[in-house]
């Protein structure tokens, strides 16, 4: 079954960590923190490429686009994984459609998420200071296994 990944960040609050949970109604895995929701959902419909989808609400002016030159994702002590990213205002998508290297990056990333404890995503921006988000991966694998 093909997967599509939608990561939605409503803000960068790391004060209150939640747990990843399986949502049967839409065959997805979700983490809800105080002001942050992250979802890994089944794309269905023949969708080939998984996508990380980030929405940066509070740190950026909603009327100005983010100029980025990519992202770096680090899980635990593994080397940083670099990838392209497409940005439309406050929304960042990864991998970029039809960029094979990004699809390969995702295939490397998912097993690390299943075995890791903490994922750090660094948005490399041209206009703002780089943005770092930390996402706990405790019980991610257990929840993800229910999607298969």
Question: For the regions a protein language model found, what residue spans apply to each?
Answer:
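Sec-dependent N-terminal signal peptides
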Residues: 3-17
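A generic "folded-domain core" signal
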Residues: 17-148
């Amino acid at each position: 079954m093909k997967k599509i990944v939608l990561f939605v960040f409503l803000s960068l609050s790391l004060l209150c960590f939640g747990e990843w949970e399986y949502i049967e109604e839409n065959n997805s895995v979700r983490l809800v923190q105080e002001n942050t929701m992250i979802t890994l959902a089944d794309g269905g419909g023949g969708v080939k490429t998984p996508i990380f989808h980030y929405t940066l609400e509070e740190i950026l002016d909603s009327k100005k686009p983010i100029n980025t030159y990519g992202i770096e994702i680090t899980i635990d002590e593994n080397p940083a994984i670099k990838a392209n990213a497409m940005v439309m205002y406050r929304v960042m998508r990864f991998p970029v459609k039809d960029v094979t290297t990004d699809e390969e990056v995702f295939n490397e990333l998912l097993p690390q998420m299943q075995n890791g404890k903490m994922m750090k995503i660094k948005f490399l921006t041209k206009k703002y200071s780089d943005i770092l988000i930390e996402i706990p991966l405790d019980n991610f694998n257990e929840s993800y296994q229910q999607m298969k």
